[in-house]
A protein has these predicted regions:
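Hydrophobic alpha-helical transmembrane bundles of multi-pass membrane proteins
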Residues: 1-113
């Protein structure tokens, strides 16, 4: 369960990157892993109302990605766009990647490990 919860938290980290302070994100992760994830997990696992209604969660994927996705969407809506993404007239400022080798390494780690 710890790995499932960490996966949900990592989904959120990708959505709020560069827009939230580290301390605030840690507080949010404690709330997510301590309250939100267990409550939504109990709905599906352990005889919760979703399991009684016939809901099947293959390997925990619905709960993990549901919790992470909804929390990420909520964080993105609350925080808004990254600073410098839009100019005063509303036009989009291009923000090219800053470290392509590190991004490539991260992609390979996710794909193959």
């Amino acid at each position: 369960q710890m790995v499932f919860c960490a996966t949900a938290a990592s989904i959120v980290s990708g959505a709020v990157a560069e827009r939230v302070k580290l301390k605030a994100f840690f507080v949010f992760v404690v709330l997510l892993c301590g309250f939100i994830y267990p409550i939504q997990g109990s709905w599906s696992w352990g005889g919760g109302y979703l399991s009684e209604a016939g809901f099947l969660d293959f390997a925990g994927s619905s709960i993990v990605h549901g919790v992470g996705g909804w929390a990420a969407l909520t964080g993105a809506i609350i925080l808004g766009a990254r600073k410098g993404k839009y100019s005063d007239d509303g036009s989009v400022n291009p923000m090219p990647g800053s470290n392509l080798p590190l991004a490539t390494l991260g992609t390979f780690i996710l794909w193959f490990l």
